[in-house]
Amino acid sequence: MRGWLEEAIEPVLTGALLAALRAKDPSGAELAAMAAVLRQACPLPGPRPELQLVDTCGTGGDGANTFNISTAVAFVAAACGAHVAKHGNRSASGSVGSADVLEAAGLNLQAPAPQVVGALPTAGVTFLFAPGWHPALVGLAPLRRGLGVRTVFNLLGPLVNPLQPDCQVLGVGAEGLLDPMAQALALLGVERAVVVHGHGGLDEASLGGPSQLRLVEAGSVRADRLEPDRLGLQMAPLEALVGGDVATNRAILEAVLQGRSTAPQRDVVALNAALVLWAAGRAASVADGVPLALAAMASGAAWRRFEALRDALL
């Protein structure tokens, strides 16, 4: 990893190494070691806020073309009292990434780092646009695009938030990534986290059936499952959560945060936000978090968090 960051490895060899890493599932220890090096390469421009921070960044790549669920979740959780440091990027595929939809909604992705961090105490949420915080990786971007496949760096994205959040909800699109990602979070010292793989292959908790969870607390990992109908939420097919182009996804994001979305869009955000509220200690259980999240959307409080962040980054 240090060789890549220092550009000491030839591009041809880099491509071969990335392809080799893709051929095996990395262990939690390997992911944690690589993430630790990347974290050291992106020092903060100033002191870290003395707040308990939570991130909602997942691996993406589930191919389901849902709307930007975890992005909406960030603002809903903030409206419920969590301090959310959302780490994200543009989409590397044909789908719409968190940065794409937030930029379309008016968020300034190029705000200076002190301004981005400084938004947290007032807005309760901020967005760290990954390319601006990881300049050492810029040189690898053309090679990664040229390979045309997902690489280990897609897994590292959720592990290298520069603010090193205390808590996290991390969605994975493959069930085999549940344990490695949970182990990596534990090794990196995250206080409490949820790694989730949704029914139907989603990298979010799903309304279509049970979601598989790994709960990380104080360095230990345990398995659990989440069933939406037991939390008072209506089951819904994947088709009810599908997004579209950036304009469509922006419209859905705004509708969700303003309390005027469809019931499945609202409920899947509430389900995932409840996981965040539990991880951040803002709800005693996931079940307790669901009504808090629903109220934040219905009242427009989640939209006001978005407006506060948009104004803070002008």
Question: What does each of the following model-derived ranges do?
Answer:
Residues 1-32, 39-48, 268:
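N-terminal glycine-rich anion-binding loops that anchor highly charged ligand groups
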Residues 40-43, 47, 66, 81, ...:
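Glycine-rich anion-binding loops and their surrounding alpha/beta cores
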Residues 91-107:
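Active-site-proximal loop->helix
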Residues 62-74, 87, 93-96, 137, ...:
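Short glycine/serine/threonine-rich phosphate/pyrophosphate-binding segments
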Residues 25-88:
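Active-site cofactor/substrate anionic-group-binding motifs, chiefly glycine-
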Residues 13-16, 85-87, 195:
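Short beta-strand segments at enzyme active-site cores
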